Amino acid sequence: MANAAKTITVEQTASAIRRHHSQRATLIGLKLNKIGRTAELQDTPEVRGMISKVQHLVRIVDEK
């Protein structure tokens, strides 16, 4: 059986209003656009970097 890819669930906790356009674009890249929305993403270094860029706007809900 192939190794299952690890996933990470993130939730948007703050608004993107009055944020830099690059932070808004990062949220869109994380499949988030409204407060309270969650997205399940693959746990890769790229995704971790995106999360760290907007860590004041999101929280990690679950890591599998």
From Swiss-Prot:
Keyword NAD tagged: no
Molecular function GO terms recorded: structural constituent of ribosome
Stored InterPro entries: Ribo_uL30_ferredoxin-like_sf, Ribosomal_uL30_bac-type, Ribosomal_uL30_ferredoxin-like
Source taxon at top rank: Bacteria
GO biological process: translation
Keyword Glycosyltransferase recorded: no
Pfam families from the UniProt entry: Ribosomal_L30
Entry's Gene Ontology cellular component terms: cytosolic large ribosomal subunit
Gene3D superfamilies: Ribosomal protein L30, ferredoxin-like fold domain (3.30.1390.20)
Keywords: Ribonucleoprotein, Ribosomal protein
Family: Belongs to the universal ribosomal protein uL30 family.
Subunit relationships: Part of the 50S ribosomal subunit.
Protein name: Large ribosomal subunit protein uL30
Taxonomic source organism: Rhodopseudomonas palustris (strain BisA53)
Organism lineage: Bacteria, Pseudomonadati, Pseudomonadota, Alphaproteobacteria, Hyphomicrobiales
Gene: rpmD
